[in-house]
Amino acid sequence: MRGLLAGLAIVLMLSSCQTDKEQKPSPTPSAYRGEVTLGSKSLTEQYLLMKMSALLLKDQGYKVNEMVFLDSPAIRSAMEAGIADLYWEYTTTARIFYHKQTPIFDPDIAYREVSRTDAGNKIIWLAKSSFNSSWALLMRKDISEQLHIYRISDLADYIRTQRTKMKFATNAEYLQREDGLDRLKEIYDFELPDDQVVAIESDLLSQTVKDGRVDVAVGMGSDPRIKKNGLIILQDDRKVFPPYEAVPVILEKTLEHYPDIRTTMESLTPYITNENMLDLMYQVDILQKDITKTSRDFLVKNKLLAP
């Protein structure tokens, strides 16, 4: 789901106390709280989550090291080995790939179960955000409004009643997944012949919808090109897609040593929403803004950091 890759990770250590040009002067000895290592997968959304977390913890007096890992197995292994203290994980990633369990489609139950399982691994899941980096059905906003299609149920009703041959695009992975296109058609009760489905590269999905070459795409809800291309995400009202809600996870021993990290992280979590993350990724990926400045401006705007 998250583009997991096998093998050894390529890890880049970023010592924020040395490389962050925007950092304040090092905290005085009396303000110094300790040293923690934050991790990130190699994704823009993860860079943003790590950077915002690092800025807040540095503001609280921590020396923060930032490490970027190639993929999910690498960062999980680093946490289990005690190399990384904290990073942001996704509920269904943990459920499927770490715990080797079938997906749970209710977000609250999924969060509860991965939290319970990882407690036995000495890994603590803090409060979850509402940012859901999962699959999504994408449609042009103007066509959605014209046809009054705002939910996947609306789309299914339209296909059934209008007998229309709408064309879908997705990537090869979704076509092959057990919980992929066949589940979508079953849960929402509509037919979609093979000749109405095309498989293309993930990076091209939103552009293909924008250009009108297809009517709908099944892509990632965290793609910043959704905003750029004037698309909307149809509401998944029957929960066909498993939740990939982003949650800060921390080693139990680190949290015991620095219990105030929970408060710091949970001050940020309510602001990690789909809308905010899409906007932040749009600024970084599309407008090419600096990720540290973008993160700091967001925290200042929401009064989590002083100007």
Where are these regions (language model features)?
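Short, well-ordered beta-strand elements
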Residues: 30-45, 62-68, 163-170
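A conserved helix-loop-strand patch within extracytoplasmic ligand-binding domains
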Residues: 109-167, 252, 270-274
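Ligand-binding "clamshell"
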Residues: 98-126, 213, 225-239
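Ligand-binding pocket segment of bilobal, Venus flytrap-like solute-binding proteins
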Residues: 163-236
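Short helix-initiation/N-cap motifs at beta->coil->alpha
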Residues: 44, 62-77, 172, 194-207
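Ligand-binding cleft/hinge of the Venus flytrap
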Residues: 53-60, 151-194, 296-304
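Bacterial signal peptide processing site
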Residues: 18-21
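C-terminal motif of bacterial Sec signal peptides marking the signal peptidase cleavage site
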Residues: 13-16
